Amino acid sequence: LMPIVINKREIVTKDVYMKESTKLLEEVVVSAGRFEQKLSDVTVSMDVVKSGDIARQAPTDISSTLRTLPGVDIVDKQPSMRGGSGWTYGVGARSQILVDGMSTLNPKTGEINWNTVPLENVEQVEVIKGASSVLYGSSALNGIINIRTARPGLTPKTRFSAYVGVYGDAENDEYQWSDKSFWKEDKYAVKPILRGSLLSGVRNPIYEGFDLSHSRCIGNFDVSGGINLFTDEGYREQGYNKRFRMGGSLTYHQPDMGMKLLNYGFNVDFLSNQYGDFFIWRSPTEVYKPSPFTN
């Protein structure tokens, strides 16, 4: 701005127009030391995946995104970091999975069910590759995956995404287990909406789903919620997955009165999951069909 000179008993009017400027601040993480730190100050090997990067991949669950990170593998649906063991019967996981700092591992078996992770409301994923048992217990021997859910901003925000996919042909014609007549029999355990309309003539299995989330501030309250619906016929016969998940949170921020502030809130989650799987196939030429002895 140019200097403004005002003489005695003189009134000067000056119009000032301001424009919006956006500046990306340093990323802040909490997993490395259980408190907020700048990513540049963290001394351990750490990757951060933002919600925009996840949305561009259109994954059906968060494990599809994690397997793209260097040093992270998903073996038998369980995470493994830098070649370490993932999950072992009777021992449990060696990579801790957290959602907002709370463990999501099954308390009995120590494994992760990716269907429980609210993909529709993820803000960022923090991945620490390396032992962190001192802070997070024995399950964090190989590393930590901390999934942070989104918090309401200054303006209400609604996100919606829909996706559909078709599995390719089997690598060998002998392995192909489905055709158009198979789906017309209408005897399969799950049936996507598009199977009965737009994709009724497709012989291969399909999957479809949508995510919806909304967040806003109402006075001193933060309100957020999300819904996910996913149907997958599976690339193997009877390897289907049908999922309905919804959840929400309500947080109250105590007004600032010159004292330390406390936040009060609660979360509600609901999951309905119908799925099928097998690990013994029928024959060497029918590897995508379950053995009759597994029923």
Feature-to-residue mapping (PLM):
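Transmembrane beta-barrel strands of outer-membrane/channel proteins
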Residues: 160-166, 225-229, 266-272
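Outer-envelope beta-barrel architecture signal
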Residues: 93-95, 154-160, 208-210, 219-223, ...
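Residues on the lipid-exposed face of transmembrane beta-strands in outer-membrane beta-barrel proteins
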Residues: 210-216, 248-252
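Short, acidic, small-residue-rich periplasmic hinge/interaction motif at the N-terminus
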Residues: 7-55
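Extracytoplasmic beta-strand/coil segments of soluble accessory domains associated
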Residues: 46, 63-102, 106, 123
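Short strand-turn segments of transmembrane beta-barrel domains in outer membranes
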Residues: 152-214, 234-236
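Flexible loop and strand-edge segments within Gram-negative outer membrane beta-barrel domains
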Residues: 232-247, 251-295
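Short acidic/polar hinge/loop motifs at secondary-structure boundaries
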Residues: 102-129, 148-150, 176-181
